[in-house]
Design a protein with these regions (language model features):
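Conserved active-site tyrosine of GNAT-family acetyltransferases
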Residues: 115, 120, 140
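Short glycine/proline-centered loop/turn elements that form peptide/ligand docking sites
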Residues: 85, 108-111, 128-133
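Conserved hydrophobic beta-strand within the GNAT/NAT acetyltransferase core sheet
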Residues: 66, 100-104
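Residue-level recognition of the GNAT/N-acetyltransferase active site
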Residues: 72, 76, 103-107, 132
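Acetyl-CoA-dependent GNAT
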Residues: 2-74, 78, 85-87, 91-95, ...
């Protein structure tokens, strides 16, 4: 597996993965627009030309927010999400970011365990943040 910065050739596969993994997915056009966003950093995990996972963030001015992370269902439980989060943290730190914040569904125990293992701590809660189904988001933060 290789972790690369998102390029135009990856956008269609990332959009397909977004539709597969989320009830309220980003459009292909929205993902493509991130290529020209100087505040954005998106990474993809690629195996044999196939995007098996991705992660996206935005930074303003030295604080970063994780926008999305997803791994194809056929490739889960192999450490891909952890590798993507770790690579993102490293890249953001090199770019001068001092922290990374994210939201996670309060019921997403596997993700919460992974983020805790990677050094994220609870920073707050957003009631009814998610739709389909309606659910609170936990705000997690890691100092880089």
């Amino acid at each position: 597996m290789k972790i690369l910065e998102l390029r135009g050739e990856h956008v269609t596969q990332v959009a397909a993965l977004e539709r597969l993994c989320f009830a309220d997915p980003w459009s292909e056009k929205s993902i493509a627009s991130e290529l020209n966003n100087p505040l954005a950093l998106w990474l993809v995990a690629v195996e044999e030309e196939e995007v098996v996972g991705y992660i996206g963030s935005q930074t303003v001015p030295d604080e970063s927010d994780m926008m999305n992370v997803a791994v194809h269902p056929d490739h889960r439980r192999r450490g891909i999400a952890q590798a993507l989060v770790t690579a993102l943290c490293d890249a953001l730190k090199k770019r001068g970011s001092v922290s990374l914040t994210l939201e996670v569904r309060s019921s997403n125990e596997p993700a919460k365990a992974m983020y805790e293992k990677l050094g994220f701590g609870l920073a707050g809660r957003r009631p009814n943040y998610y739709r389909n189904p309606k659910e609170d988001a936990l705000i997690l933060r890691k100092m880089l």
